[in-house]
Amino acid sequence: MKYLLGIDLGTSGTRSVLFNPDGEVIAAKSAEYPLSQPQNGWAEQDPQDWWEAAIATISHVVRQSGVDPRQIAALGISGQMHGLVMLDEKGQVLRPSIIWADQRTGEECEDITRLVGKERLIEITANPALTGFTASKIMWVKKHQPDIYKKTRHILLPKDYLRYKLTGDFATEVSDASGMQLLDVPGRQWSQEVLDKLGIARELLARVYESPEVTGHVSEEASRLTGLSQSTLVVGGAGDNAAAAVGTGTVRDGRAFTTVGTSGVIFAHSSKIAIDPKGRVHTFCCAVPGAWHVMGVMQSAGLSKRWIRDTLCQAEIAQAEKLGIDSYDLVDALAAKSPVGSNRLIYLPYLMGERTPHLDPDCRGVFFGLSAMHQRGDLIRAVMEGVSFGLRDSLEILDGMGVKADKMLLTGGGAKSAFWRQLLADVYARPLSLINSPEGPALGVAILAGVGAGVYQSVESACDALVRPGDAIRPDTGKAAVYQRFHRLYQQLYPALKQSWQELARL
């Protein structure tokens, strides 16, 4: 029997999962690592932490499964997108990785827009210049750390650094490369025009593959460290959201999913390229060769809930530890005591700036309507509602573009909360289906690995056979009507505060 390994490099940790050809989990292991925020709005991680987590989780899975490593036919890697990894001529990391959540590059985004032209940039890369994307991070290092930039010989994305450590190959694939702002997204190749205008050498970038293509095999050194066989193939893999799309079966028109992780995502498949000329949502190449996806991204989805838990719910965290339960269950119980609308309290979820729909690194979180009568449960529920309103903003933009999201699936850590699942259905005013497999991104890249190794004929046929959505979560029409009114007020708050946030950033 041939087995398939999926590795998911997230923001809070890495997870390795071994699957059989039927998509059943044979063994799994996770390992966490820290996030560094040396200044307000900055976010960095040490790539060595990723590699050590990969070694620990892969080796554990190989041992725990009892599978002959030679039977692991192929592996795929999913990862947090946009992070900048810079290597010298010896392949050594030159500085901590500036990751997706970092917001320091506002000036560099202005430079990119000026050098390429706003409309032309969107035509080529399908997106406006954004602080979260990789190109602005490269420009920041070039401007502020020129000595490091001069030593740079290879620029990689987070998951592709793991690929390099596993295989020795410098490679990436179209879905993740789309988030660098250096790819010709309609043409699925590096844009020489953008590279020339930004003064970035093509030689610094890795070769671009389609997601199911084989990019190499496990090296002798990686085999020794992980227990994998050198015969195990490594495929292109995918960025975290593109991988989740495969893992949730979102590989045909009309299919979409919501991810409530550290960030929040609304993602829809499209067999034809669709670009928002205002740049509010992102269009990337997807993991299905020859297709694309359109997605809206909010910076602080699950992050907002974790922040409110860590700030206000230390007693619940301690109680949950004693009871051996998830602290979020107790947090949800507090929120459930608050009515729809959180007693007229609205939360703006901009803890780390915002991407969709505002493209604003300076906006920050707000509680609007806070009064002496509000309790902890009101604040918690307001946070969950505010995140849900932010996700609905993306959904409305997709509807306006004609990108269908008829079959909406739900995944991510936030989807584990039954309370939040129902709340999302009520805010969206449409049914949701929970994915039965909790291993979305890892399963997605395992499927891609299976296609590359010849275990499956195509991405679509594999998803049809392996991925089954759960029962539908239907909206409460009465609550949905109330949320419609609250969402309209929510949408009025950003423009009212935009100038004030800009002034705050200058203080």
State where each predicted segment sits.
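Active-site core segments that coordinate phosphate-bearing ligands/cofactors
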Residues: 5-6, 47, 106, 113-135, ...
